[in-house]
Amino acid sequence: MTFKKILVGSALLLTTIFNNNVYAKDKKLELINVSYDPTRELYVEYNKLFTKYWKDKKGQDVVIQQSHGGSGKQARSVIDGLKADIVTLALAYDIDAIAEKASLLSPEWQKKLPHNSSPYTSTIVFLVKKGNPKHIKDWNDLVKTDVSVITPNPKTSGGARWNYLAAWAYALEHNNKDEEKAKEFIGKLYKNVKILDTGARGSTVTFTQRGIGDVLIAWENEALLSLHQPGGDKFEIVNPSLSVLAEPPVAVIDKNAAKKGTTEIAKAYLEQLYSKDAQEIIAKFYYRPSDLEVAKKYANTFPKIKLVDINYFGGWKQAQKKHFDDNGLFDQIYK
């Protein structure tokens, strides 16, 4: 299935599994999973696994609706009233914002599931044209004046914020932690960005389908998936010398689920992401599984890259305020 086919129609993907032997006493359950941009294929597959699991366990049919878009934009939709039962977003700050601004879940939500409520991780890499004609090897090559860079907008996209922070970390590490020099580096990089799509998938389409740009800064899973799409042989991946440990978290939106009577199934939906079968699906779609046995099985898929985590930037609250809030560093360098 191509990206174009996936993008046709509404951003709201309805995945429905029916069973002819429906118990009359059981009301069909409905869940809304509000997710970030490039998880579409992952959750199409996982939803099939989960609906079968729930049918076998409870004898109930489940309808799961998927909403995808830039993580920040998705979080705002939930804050503004989208009745999500669960969120599976790109970064913890976006779920923190739902807890803080709408009080729809506990501020301690991240302690409820293993690995800081992140059943999978990823990192940030470069996707370039086959043969790497611009000889892109590392972040410093992205600031050359003849290189056109594609990356989403960090104001709306979680992946874009990870992209930015990976570049910021590289700049700090290569300039003795001098923030003024890092700011100058980031300014040069974003001067080479001509299009800021609202989400990671939009940027992938801009680069792989529309043929715009010399390099795509991308989620590792998105870059690997691109290589396995029709036309994927036109591209190759470059792993930078330094990147970030991206931890996309998941959470039940407690107040919405309680009102809808879906708390039990919403919790089960997220808990099952840690099951062996789900972790296999996660690896199949090129996310780094949290289960150590499954991760070992797929070790050759994921190269070893030097990574820094969000604590390198002082945590998400500090990183968001410093870099991405109104009048933050991003607004200062990208006008």
Predicted regions and their residues:
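Extracellular/periplasmic juxtamembrane helices and adjacent flexible linkers that interface
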Residues: A257-K335
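Short helix-loop capping/hinge motifs at secondary-structure junctions, enriched
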Residues: G131-K137, T156, A169-K177, N256-E264
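Bacterial N-terminal signal peptides that target proteins for export
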Residues: M1-V8
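Short beta-strand->loop
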Residues: V34-Y36, V128-K130, S148-N175, Y190-V193, ...
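Ligand-binding pocket segment of bilobal, Venus flytrap-like solute-binding proteins
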Residues: H174-S241
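C-terminal segment of classical bacterial N-terminal signal peptides
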Residues: T15-Y23
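N-terminal segment of the mature folded domain
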Residues: K25-T156, A299, Y334
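A bilobed periplasmic-binding-protein/Venus flytrap-type ligand-binding module shared by bacterial periplasmic
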Residues: I124-N132, E247-E264, I281-F285
